[in-house]
């Protein structure tokens, strides 16, 4: 796990987003995920490549930065249990990650996401894939990044010589533009891309702990970053699909029962990921019933 400050990661949400992405990738073309222009033939990927932060990352031994599942004995880690959203998508096609293999054959999912990553790190992650062989037109790529940027900007607002609110919002917008620029560059390299906007940081356990004013600013910063992603990515559903993670988090927080959630404000993990497992949850917490895994 990165020593850098990190935002709370979604618990139940990671699978809900995965379901949304699965619907996108199984439907008749990426156009069903959002974005104009229809596609006649369904897109069937030969590889999955994931970019982003801890929401999409693994440790070398397959641990996730969320609630980690255990085998039937209740003690042995099982990286396939409680899959993060990128695993849900990979599972549709029978793909596995090197960090969490499926079978003994070639693992056709590649995780480039890194814990603690910011918008500026996305270009580095993409370049790592370019150096390893690049992209092909049957590659499905996922991008979800920006939550750590929002926390960084919020921490700037608390400094003695804090930038103005307008300056912070503009900085968030620029992070969104930077992310969108890399998404469009991925398309130029031949990949099909699904972009997930980041959850509303103001609704996370850490965000709520900042008080009403702090949470409101975090929500505004989140909206500024996500908004620039949405208006700057290529608006062509043949190449780019969009999943609204921010709207999901807002709906889940407002009406948790709609997603079979019993808690949408507290962190499920009693210890910080990636050490968190289904055996180390807070009192009353469940991996599927609580929206947020972590609050650090």
What role is predicted for each listed range?
Residues 3, 33-296:
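Conserved active-site regions of diverse hydrolases
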């Amino acid at each position: 796990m990165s020593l850098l400050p990190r935002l709370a990661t979604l618990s139940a949400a990671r699978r809900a987003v995965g379901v949304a992405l699965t619907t996108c990738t199984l439907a008749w073309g990426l156009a069903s995920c959002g974005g104009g222009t229809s596609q006649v033939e369904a897109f069937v990927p030969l590889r999955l490549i994931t970019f982003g932060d801890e929401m999409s990352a693994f440790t070398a031994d397959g641990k996730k930065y969320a609630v980690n599942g255990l085998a039937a004995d209740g003690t042995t880690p099982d990286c396939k249990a409680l899959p993060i959203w990128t695993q849900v998508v990979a599972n549709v096609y029978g793909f596995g990650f090197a960090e969490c293999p499926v079978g003994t054959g070639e693992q056709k999912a590649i995780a480039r996401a890194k814990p603690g990553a910011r918008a500026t790190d996305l270009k580095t992650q993409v370049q790592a894939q370019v150096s390893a062989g690049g992209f092909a037109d049957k590659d499905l790529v996922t991008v979800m990044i920006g939550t750590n940027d929002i926390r960084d900007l919020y921490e700037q607002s608390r400094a003695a010589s804090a930038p103005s609110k307008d300056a912070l919002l503009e900085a968030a917008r620029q992070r969104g533009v930077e992310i969108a620029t890399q998404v469009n560059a991925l398309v130029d390299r031949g990949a099909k891309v699904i972009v997930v906007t980041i959850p509303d940081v103001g609704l996370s356990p850490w965000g709520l702990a900042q008080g009403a004013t702090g949470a409101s600013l975090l929500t505004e910063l989140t909206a500024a970053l996500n908004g620039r992603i949405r208006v700057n990515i290529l608006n062509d559903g043949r190449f780019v699909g969009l999943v609204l993670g921010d709207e999901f988090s807002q709906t889940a927080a407002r009406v948790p029962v709609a997603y079979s959630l019993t808690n949408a404000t507290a962190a499920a993990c009693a210890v910080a990921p990636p050490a968190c497992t289904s055996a180390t949850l807070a009192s009353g917490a469940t991996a599927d019933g609580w929206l947020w895994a972590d609050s650090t």
